[in-house]
Amino acid sequence: MKFDTVIMGGGLAGLLCGLQLQQHGLRCAIVTRGQSALHFSSGSLDLLSTLPDGQPVTDITAGLDALCRQAPEHPYSRLGAQKVLTLAQQAQTLLNASGAQLYGDVQQAHQRVTPLGTLRSTWLSSPEVPVWPLSAQRICVVGVSGLLDFQAHLAAASLRQRDLNVETAEIDLPELDVLRDNPTEFRAVNIARLLDNEEKWPLLYDALSPIATNCDMIIMPACFGLANDTLWRWLNERLPCALTLLPTLPPSVLGIRLHNQLQRQFVRQGGIWMPGDEVKKVTCRRGTVSEIWTRNHADIPLRPRFAVLASGSFFSSGLVAEREGIREPILGLDVQQTATRAEWYQQHFFDPQPWQQFGVVTDDAFRPSLAGNTVENLYAIGSVLAGFDPIAEGCGGGVCAVSALQAAHHIAERAGEQQ
């Protein structure tokens, strides 16, 4: 099977790269093994929250300039501040075109409220998520009886420290009792599958309506809206106060929805989606990828003009840690890592950990190297890249988006030259 591009990995980076390549008229396939890290995320995307020296970032342009000085090997630093901003804006447009109407400004970070009621600087958030400063003084944090994925009293306690009048309440929906037989099934995603049924909407409205008359804003867990935000908008139009949603413990309704919106858009535009499959081997000839062999297609290889590695980091097995070191398991690409295992980590758990910055070695076009030689038609994007700490620096989603679009533009340019 011949394709212009085969993307190995169906997470945020892989999907955005595929969508951008489709804009250039290229035929793409995505091979994906299972759920991506988006399923376990908040659904918000960070661009750059903190510099390596610990300074918080609010002005993104100034932050990117400082990052270039402090971390010259960071994926952003390789592109330059203006290029990063341009690609980030393109990514936001691409997300909106896919139905993910995310709120945010590429030039200025905003602060969203987290499930614990604290504030986190971010780039893009779902419109349901409350952002600081809140537009209300009297707030009620509402939990769902029996839901262990969200603790209303913890969020309320944090918000009270910000001089807000915050109460807590709990709603009990007997219609959810069918999920209570097994506590592990009473999770936000399963509740959403039930509440998203339009017949159940009035039940949720009836439960929230008495609470809404005594406050200016309701904050509750995101336990509905798996496909879209229609129910949230329906409730906001009818309740006498604002309704906002906080992401829960994984799996996350907002994260799954974002992934599904991108995946459906990719398929709608003619992309080939290969779920439940796994790349077992990649054949390289004369420094280029010639064939990709997957588990489900056995002896039928995929033959791409270009290939993209978007396999993720340790969480997605895009990188594997062994006693001897860190390796990239599909091709055995060169990996940037510390010389000894003892240098992988810091003693204090909450300190920035060196292993977070491990990843494949690439050139400035994000083409990785194998035994010191660049693989000419292969690009590495997203969390598999080296040189950044997505947790400490708050840049995971941004690096995925920016590197994906940079690789897509580079591939499209080269594909046009080869025609």
From Swiss-Prot:
Gene3D superfamilies per the UniProt record, alphabetical: FAD/NAD(P)-binding domain
Protein name: Anaerobic glycerol-3-phosphate dehydrogenase subunit B
EC assignment: 1.1.5.3
Function: Conversion of glycerol 3-phosphate to dihydroxyacetone. Uses fumarate or nitrate as electron acceptor.
GO biological process per UniProt: glycerol catabolic process
One Pfam family recorded for the sequence: FAD_binding_2
Catalytic activities: a quinone + sn-glycerol 3-phosphate = dihydroxyacetone phosphate + a quinol
Naturally occurring in which organism (per UniProt): Salmonella agona (strain SL483)
MF terms (GO), sorted A to Z: glycerol-3-phosphate dehydrogenase (quinone) activity
Needed cofactors: FMN
